Every structure is written in structure tokens, then in C-alpha cells.
Amino acid sequence: MQPDRLDLHALHHFRTRSPLTHCMTNDVVQTFTANVLLALGASPAMVIEAEEAEQFAAMADALLINVGTLTAPRAQAMRRAIEGAMAAGKPWTLDPVAVGALSYRTRFCQQILSLKPAAIRGNASEILALAGMSAGGRGVDTTDTASSALPAAIALARQTHAIVAVTGEVDYVTDGQRTQTITGGDVMMTRVVGTGCALSAVVAASCSLPGDRLNNVAAACGFMKQAGSVAVKESRGPGSFASAFIDALWNLEAQA
């Protein structure tokens, strides 16, 4: 999948605006997430202390809430960060990692849905569970297909007024009325930890860009799919794929 004009327009905004993206993400993926954002032209920051998180969320252009390694103190810090972002009119994005499979994070994510996320990005099982249509998958792994979760994504978008991206072999991005389909990528993306979480950070950054938010989130998904398609041709396994993936993001304009 080559980036189209819309994707390149969004990429131009990434590169020229360098959105400061506050990533309250899980401990496993922080470095990879930061490198993905940097390769696209965004500016990552990982601030987790509750008092600082609230302050920084108000300064940043966008906030990501990823519950992959959620703890009670971190949940408190995330709430405060969301409050800071909302008070400053900054968009925040939810990545409901393993929601439906684990009870504490499921309750937490259901509670913060009322705080008006700009976007929600999850796999099929997570989106189904968050929409109240399924018990969830096997931890961070999905047991459903993205297409099977599309009705749940549409319902969740209508309920929350957020852009919902349900991702997998094919990605679907919806605002509850319009839906975009993004193809491409490679199965190797599932063999490197953090590609989904990093996508959520790119989605968060995209929510701060001017223009149609649905299109910007779809463009974010397209960037990652395109990089995966390129990286698999330049790599010999998961280790080299991760490096090639970052390089492919960096070189997106040259590939268009």
C-alpha cells in the first residue's frame, strides 16, 4: 500500500509540526514507541508521575493512555493526565490493552470512556469487549478478526464520539458514520513486540493534526502498514525487521 495524497499530506504535518506526544504507555514498548514517533517526525515524551503527568499533558499536543502495564498508582496518574489534557483542550487516545481479559483494566477503561477520548485503537477482542459485545481475547492477543469487530467499533464510535480504529490483518477506522479500510503490512509485525502499541501513539499524535480526524487516523494506520510491507523485504527475521521498520517509517516520503 503506497501512501496516497491524503497520507502524504498528513505525513507533511507530522514532519513540519512535530507533535509533542505524551505517551503514558506500557513498560515493554516505550523505547520502540519513541523511535516510531521520532521516525515519523513527532516528538515523544514519557511522563508518568501523577503531578507531572497532569502538568505535561496540558503542555503536550496529544496524550496516549495505554493500559498494558496498568497499576493502581499509574491509573491515578493517567486520570490526572486526562484531566490536564481535557482542561487544555488537547486530544487523548485510549489503547485498551487486554480489556475484557482482565478485570481491573476493564473497569478502568470503561470508567474513563466518559472522559471523551478523541480516538480508541485496539485489536478486535479489545474493541468488542470495550463495546460490551464480548468477554475479550487471550491477554494482549486477539481471538477475533477485525472485520468481525467492525459493528462493535461503529457502535463504540457512536457511543463515545471518538474515532475508533480496530486493527489486525486489515484495519478499519470509523467515526460511527464513515469507515475507512486500510490494507497492507505483514504478519511479521505480530512477531515484534510493540507494533500495535506504537500505532496507538501514532494515532494519538495524528489526532492533534489539522484536518479531518478520521482521515488523519486512517493515515496513521496506513503509515504503519506501508512500513511493515517495506521492512519485511529488507529483513531476515524479527530482529532485523524491527530496525528495518523504523527505517521504513523514516523513508516513507521516498517510497511514495
From Swiss-Prot:
EC top class named in words: transferase
Binding site for ATP: R121, T167
Alphabetic keyword roster: ATP-binding, Kinase, Magnesium, Metal-binding, Nucleotide-binding, Thiamine biosynthesis, Transferase
A GO biological process held by the record: thiamine biosynthetic process
Gene Ontology MF annotations: ATP binding; hydroxyethylthiazole kinase activity; magnesium ion binding
Pathway involvement of the protein, from the record: Cofactor biosynthesis; thiamine diphosphate biosynthesis; 4-methyl-5-(2-phosphoethyl)-thiazole from 5-(2-hydroxyethyl)-4-methylthiazole: step 1/1
EC number: 2.7.1.50
Cofactor(s) this protein requires: Mg(2+)
Protein name: Hydroxyethylthiazole kinase
Native source species: Enterobacter sp. (strain 638)
